[in-house]
Amino acid sequence: MERIIKVIQEEADKEVQCSTLLTMGLFGLLKMQFVCHLIICYVFLVSGLIVNFLQLCTLPLWSINKQLARKVNCRLAYCISSQMVALLEWWSGTECTLYTDPASYPFYGKEDAIVVLNHNFEIDFLCGWTFCERFGVLGSSKVLAKKELAYVPVIGWMWYFLEIVFCKRKWEEDQKTVVQSLQRLKDYPENFWFLLYCEGTRFTQKKHKISMEVAERKGLPKLKYHLLPRTKGFCVTVQHLRGKVTAVYDSTLNFRNNQTPTLLGILNGKKYHADLYVRRIPLDSIPENESECAIWLHKLYQEKDELQEKYSVTGRFPGPTLSPPRRPWALLNWLFWICLLLFPLCLLLLQLFHSGSAFTICTTVLLCFAASLGVRWMIGQTEINRGSSYGNKEGQLNNNAQVSKVTNKDSRTTKTSAACTAGIKNNHEQFSTKQEGNTQLDQDTGSCSC
C-alpha cells in the first residue's frame, strides 16, 4: 500500500513539474514576441514623456524651494529609470550576487559615494542602476555624461532635471561647467551615488590593442581586461565632491559561464546571472593632489585587472557573497504605467479598425512599422561595436598617459610619484590634441558612454 501511495505521489510530482515547465515555456515564448517588445517600448517612451512634462512643471518650484524641487525630481526620475531595472530583474529574471565585505554592507545606500565600474558589457549601465535600486538610491543616482545626451527625450531630459554633470569632452570648454555642476551637488538633499566609467568607452579588442600600445609607449603596466583609465574626470570629481562624498566603491561586474548579455536578450526574457564585486574605499585614503590621485587610479585598475584574472580562472570573486533582495517598487511602478497606458491604446486601436477605413488601417500599420524600426535603432545604440571610437594618434587616449611606470612595489613609490607628476605637467600642455572623428579623447572626462 505504501509503495502504491509513493508511486502516485511521484506521478503527481512529475505532472506538476511538466505543467510548470510548460507554463514557463509558453511564458518564455511570449517574451520573445516582437509585439511584447513594442508594448514595452511604447510604455517606456510615453510614460517617459509624461514624466518629462511633469519635471518641466517643477521649474517654478526651483525658485521657491530648491530642495523640495530636487526631491520631487528624484521621485519622478525613479518612474523612468526603474522601468529599465524592472525589465532586468522581473522580466528577464536576471539574478545578481554581490561580493563585498559584510562590514561595508551597512554603509550602502546610507552615504554619498563615487562608484567606479568596469565597462565591458552592453548592459553594465543597467546592472549599475540595479545596484542603485537594491539600496534605494536609483532616483538620485548621477553620472558624468556627454553633453549631447541632454537633448535626448526621456533619459536626457530626466538627467537634466536630476542635475547630471554633462561635458563636451573638451576640457578647456568643460572645466568651468563641470566644476560648477559638481559644486552644486554639495548641498544635495538625497543620498546619491555618482557612477563613473573611467575607461570612457566600452571594452573591445580593437580599443584594447590601441590602449596597450599607448601603455607601452608611456611605460605603464599593461592591463589584460581593461582599457587605460582616463584620470581627469575621476580626479576632478573626487576633488570637488570631497567633503560631501565619503567613499569610493570599486565595482567590478562579470557574468557567469562567459555569458555575453545584450539588451535584446533582456527584452527576449533571457536570464543572466551577474556577479558584482564591490570594495568600499574611504575617500580620505585617496590623495588630494591630482598627480598622486592619477597614480592611485592607475594602481586601482591594476588591482581590478588582477581581480578579473582570478574570476576568469575560478569563476567567482573572492570573499563572502550577499544577495540584496529585490524591492517591489520597480515592478509596481512598471505595472502602474502598463495599466495606465495600455487601456487607452487598446481603445484607440479598436476604434481605428472598427472604422474600416483602409487609409486609417494602413497609417496605423505604417506607424507600427516605424515604431519597430525605432525600437531596433534604440537597441542598436547599446551594442558594444557602436561605442565611441578610440583614436589612433599618440596622446589621444589619455591625457595622463605620460605617467611613468607604476608598479606595486613600495620601494619604487617615490620615484614613480615624481615621474608621474612630471608626466602629467607635460600632458597639460597638450590640451589641443584632437581625436580622429567626432569623439574628443585628448582631455579625459571619464564619461559614461552607455
Regions found by a protein language model. Give the residues of each.
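Cytosol/nucleoplasm-facing, intrinsically disordered, low-complexity tails
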Residues: M1-L22, P106-F107, K244-V245, G387-C450
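Membrane-anchoring hydrophobic helices of lipid-metabolizing enzymes
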Residues: E2-I114, C127, N398
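Alpha-helical bilayer-embedded segments of polytopic membrane proteins, i.e.
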Residues: E2-N52, L322-G380
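N-terminal pre-first-transmembrane soluble regions of secretory-pathway and organelle membrane proteins
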Residues: F44, G48-L49, L59-S63, A86, ...
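A structural signal for well-ordered alpha-helical scaffolds and beta->alpha junctions
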Residues: A77-S82, V152, R230-F234, K271
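Soluble catalytic domains of membrane acyltransferases
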Residues: L87-L263
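Cytochrome P450
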Residues: R134-L138, P344-V365, G374, N426-H428, ...
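Catalytic lobes of large eukaryotic enzymes
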Residues: E190, I210-I338, F359-C362, L367-K405, ...
